[in-house]
UniProtKB/Swiss-Prot annotation:
Entry keyword annotation includes Transport: yes
Classification of source organism: Bacteria, Bacillati, Bacillota, Bacilli, Lactobacillales
UniProt record, GO biological process: phosphate ion transmembrane transport
Gene coding for it: pstB1
Protein name according to UniProt: Phosphate import ATP-binding protein PstB 1
Entry-linked InterPro entries: AAA+_ATPase (IPR003593), ABC_transporter-like_ATP-bd (IPR003439), ABC_transporter-like_CS (IPR017871), P-loop_NTPase (IPR027417), PstB-like (IPR005670)
Reactions accelerated catalytically: phosphate(out) + ATP + H2O = ADP + 2 phosphate(in) + H(+)
Length: 252
């Protein structure tokens, strides 16, 4: 078992008076890819956004409980959210490159950190794009707009942008749902490679994707964590009937 890297304890989230997360206790280990599954509106994306305080940007949200990362509660008063999001990066459902060149997209976070050395920036661009399995596609287009790329290429550039600041954890909110099967397959293969270096937590509606590439799976339903275990156990021998019914397609 890997070393614990981030965990939530008794995490509740309310949109106004509506309780969207009902006391979630969950621990993630270093170097593992965890899939979070469940029907739409079950709380999995809401939970994911709690792990780097993205929900702070939503009006009328109340959060109680704790999320402990590197021994500190990220909801404590001394947390710098900008620094936190460099260490716990996020990739969204829709590719969201900035309206800049591919090169400027990748080094965006490094520029924020004050990095100016061209050699350092050049190396970071190549290393990150290679890690995101898109270097060969874009190496001759580095100074063209990232918006001119295909959807799959844009998503991989967004992943490279996260990798460039060398995070500990990468959060992925349905990163392949807007892409065609070929692009999705490329991203899945890339995630399997990245798992050797990063901890990843991924929301997905794709059951076969979760079973193929994740080490652990968490099943959410109506704001509750129903089951969390090794992926093989969740899919082949779930402990809870609700998990079995969801995986077998009886609801969702």
């Amino acid at each position: 078992m890997g070393k614990e890297i981030i965990s939530s304890k008794d995490l509740h989230l309310y949109y106004g008076k509506k309780e969207a997360l009902k006391g979630i206790d969950l621990t993630f280990n270093q170097g593992e890819l965890t899939a979070m599954i469940g029907p739409s509106g079950c709380g999995k994306s809401t939970y994911l956004r709690c792990l780097n305080r993205m929900n702070d940007l939503i009006p009328d949200v109340t959060i109680t409980g704790s999320v402990v990362y590197k021994g500190k509660d990220i909801y404590g008063p001394k947390t710098d959210n900008v620094e936190l999001r460099k260490e716990i990066g996020m990739v969204f459902q829709q590719p969201n490159p900035f309206p800049f060149s591919v090169y400027e997209n990748v080094i965006y976070g490094l520029r924020l950190k004050g990095v100016k050395d061209k050699q350092v920036l050049d190396e970071a661009v190549e290393t990150s794009l290679k890690a995101a399995a898109v270097w060969e596609d874009v190496k001759d287009k580095l100074h063209k707009s990232a918006l001119s790329l295909s959807g799959g290429q844009q998503q991989r550039v967004c992943i490279a942008r996260v990798l460039a600041v060398e995070p500990d954890i990468i959060l992925l909110d349905e990163p392949t749902s807007a892409l065609d099967p070929v692009s999705s397959g490329k991203i899945e293969n890339m995630l399997l490679t990245l798992k050797e270096k990063y901890t990843m937590i991924m929301v997905t509606h794709n059951m076969s994707q979760a079973s193929r590439i994740s080490d652990k799976t968490a099943f959410f339903l109506q704001g509750d964590l129903i089951e969390f275990n090794d992926t093989k156990k969740v899919f082949l021998n779930p402990k809870e009937k609700q998990t079995e019914d969801y995986i077998s397609g009886k609801f969702g």
